[in-house]
Amino acid sequence: MTHKIAILGASGYTGAELVRLIAEHPNMEIVALSGERKAGQSMAEVFPHLRHLDLPVLCKIDEIDFAGVDLCFCALPHKTSQEVIRALPATLKIVDLSADFRLRDPEAYRTWYGNEHVALEQQAEAVYGLTEFYRDQIRTARLVAGTGCNAATGQYVLRPLIAAGVIDLDEIILDLKCAVSGAGRSLKENLLHAELSEGANAYAVGGTHRHLGEFDQEFSALAGRPVQVQFTPHLIPANRGILATTYVRGDAQTVFQTLAAAYADEPFVHVLPFGETPSTHHVRGSNHCHIGVTGDRIAGRAIVIAALDNLTKGSSGQALQNANLMLGETETTGLTMAPLFP
């Protein structure tokens, strides 16, 4: 069976990544691509690397006949996404890549994103899209909320450790480096080549990054009590990739064994041999996450490092993984490509 797919926001990085991935999916056909400001243009004009594909011309959302769509990916900015999704057919399966449906508490959404939620009915039904931990709910969901790329990386490290009770919940430090594509395709002064190249900088320092809302929600639910992590992201002059270094109080071997057991049967999350550390080079362009564990010279502490591609495993690859489950496909279909190297 061929599933008819629409992608809203196809002129952005995550939208283009979805097109790249779905083009190789044997049971999906892209029937509609929206790009409000680029309507009427071909995808080859907007993204020349997709020139070889036979794709629909970009259109406006209101030009799409959703009666002929089995599943819709929404790769629009937050706030815009909720306004669009609440107007879509109530039976349409949707995977949202924005932040609009990640937080279950409307007040938490207002706190972190600065505006009221206008699609509360859809927010209430949305399933959080961290595939490895919400598979059963995702299979039967109508609306799945993709995670933040930083939030996904941190959770792959910390969820099993919190659930197993093997680390001190009051002493978690997460230091994360993210490539510039995580900021999207819009023109911003700080993302100009001359501003970014040959340098790196911290941002959202002091606990202000919006993905902390996801950490608070997910970790506190796991622990059964409030859990807050100390999280500082850094922007690095790379196109793709996240490298997250997490410092925890706990026995390093126990941390390693807990993570190795948690992901032993996972197709996309891989725990390296003890003492090895991952690189963003080794996951680039793939749906894989690599995790490495090592001890520290300070007794009773462990260092856990995770690497993934922010556009693939951190966003569009995760979205396709979820869509496969929603449509009854094998979870790994269209996602088994090896990482690009060098």
Curated annotation (Swiss-Prot):
GO terms for molecular function: N-acetyl-gamma-glutamyl-phosphate reductase activity; NAD binding; NADP+ binding. Its EC number is 1.2.1.38. Its main location: cytoplasm. It is found in: Cytoplasm. The active site is at C149. Keywords: Amino-acid biosynthesis, Arginine biosynthesis, Cytoplasm, NADP, Oxidoreductase. InterPro entries: AGPR_type-1, NAD(P)-bd_dom_sf, NAGSA_dehydrogenase, Semialdehyde_DH_NAD-bd. This is N-acetyl-gamma-glutamyl-phosphate reductase. It comes from Ruegeria pomeroyi (strain ATCC 700808 / DSM 15171 / DSS-3) (Silicibacter pomeroyi). The gene is argC.
